[in-house]
């Protein structure tokens, strides 16, 4: 597990990575129309964007990412301008945003990448239809740009744990090749262990 996926004092480390990506309507948004997260603030998308509530940790994470990249003044303007483009009041989870695009309420949203996989391979045929109507855009991918914002799922051992040895074995297993591949195959998350390649489905995105 690389240093950038660990806490400075090694009290926790990442087990998997989830990209916060743009999801767009397959037919209404052309390839190349949106390539950067900053472009969600463009007034041409007024009434086109859906979102879950800004108070959710996923959106707090992307806001922190933009703040770090642009600085406070520009980040605040970006947030206000993007909110002005909302098609409706923020509501629901990430899956609900894909459903809203499918149903024509909006054309663009932000989701964690693994929700797309969950919908694409859902046992519910209706949810598979939602996934079929959209595609993912990994933002800020141009040379020299910062790339998509990534959240992690992580693990650590509680200070007063009575089972530290067993807990350590569990965490070690979760970073093993077998477990890291399961993160991708079952939950469509990217491995934190750099020795493990993402699965074919993740690579195809």
Where are these regions (language model features)?
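Short beta-strand->loop
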Residues: 12, 38-41, 125-149, 158-160, ...
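Small-molecule pocket liners
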Residues: 18-21, 134, 152-155
């Amino acid at each position: 597990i690389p240093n950038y996926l660990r806490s400075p004092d090694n009290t926790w480390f990442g087990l998997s990575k989830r990209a916060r990506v743009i999801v767009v309507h397959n037919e209404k948004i052309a390839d190349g129309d949106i390539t950067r997260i900053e472009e969600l603030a463009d007034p041409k998308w007024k009434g086109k964007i859906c979102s879950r509530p800004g108070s959710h940790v996923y959106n707090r994470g992307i806001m922190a990412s933009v703040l770090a990249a642009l600085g406070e003044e520009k980040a605040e303007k970006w947030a206000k301008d993007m909110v002005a483009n909302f098609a409706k009041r923020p509501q629901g989870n990430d899956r609900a945003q894909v459903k809203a695009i499918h149903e024509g309420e909006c054309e663009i949203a932000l989701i964690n990448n693994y929700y797309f996989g969950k919908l694409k391979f859902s046992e519910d045929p209706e949810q598979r239809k939602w996934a079929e109507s959209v595609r993912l855009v990994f933002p800020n991918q141009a040379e020299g740009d910062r790339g998509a914002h990534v959240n992690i799922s992580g693990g650590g051992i509680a200070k007063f744990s009575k089972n530290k040895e067993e807990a350590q074995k569990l965490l070690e297993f979760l970073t093993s090749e077998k477990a890291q591949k399961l993160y991708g195959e079952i939950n469509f998350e990217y491995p934190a262990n750099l020795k493990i390649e993402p699965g074919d489905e993740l690579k195809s995105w």
